[in-house]
Amino acid sequence: MDISAQNEEAFHWACNLGHLEMAQWLFQISKERGHYINISAINDWVFRVVCGNGHLHVAQWLLQIKPDINISAQNEQAFRTACFYDYLAVAQWLFQVSKERGKTINISAEDEYAFRWSCINGHLAVAQWLQSLKPYLYVINYDENGEYQNCYIRCKKEANWEKRKYLLYIASDCKEDNLLYRLPCDVAKIMIGYV
């Protein structure tokens, strides 16, 4: 039986779906046959997908057997997707590992991708944790073209009051005379000063 058929597809899918025992068994067979599975193929793709799928136990095992995995590959993709899909434990673990390695993850990669998408997707615990790491995230702010990115405007469509209140609480420019602050408050019928 060729366990490496189709570029080690069996191993990759076992990892990606969180089947740790299956992945360990396949890896052991490859060792016994003298053909080690290439865990770092395609710029550590398996590790990145495992983290994005929330399989902390598999990610920890992969890092244990291959300590030089680039956990920051593809501009912090493992971290960003863990935040995107609400896998807080995975994101926190990756952040801790990066600190231990002396190269802390850039939590602001891809224009605050992890924070923006955790807010948009309603992952309040992830957003709060990210904000605690970098307390001066500007979530309501003009860009150089005079336009704005506003997680609040996006999340108001979901009718998630807790998330909206939190974003307004940490915003850098929540002043009563700020149109970006007043407009969403007016639309959502929130009284300014009572958020």
Predicted segments, located by residue:
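Ankyrin repeat arrays, specifically the small/polar loop and inter-repeat linker segments at the C-terminal end
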Residues: 1-8, 30-44, 66-76, 98-112, ...
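Ankyrin-repeat and related helical/solenoid repeat scaffolds used for protein-protein interactions
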Residues: 85, 111-130, 135, 142-143
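Conserved ankyrin/ankyrin-like repeat signature
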Residues: 21-22, 57-58, 89-90, 125-126
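Cullin-RING E3 adaptor/co-adaptor recruitment helices
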Residues: 146-195
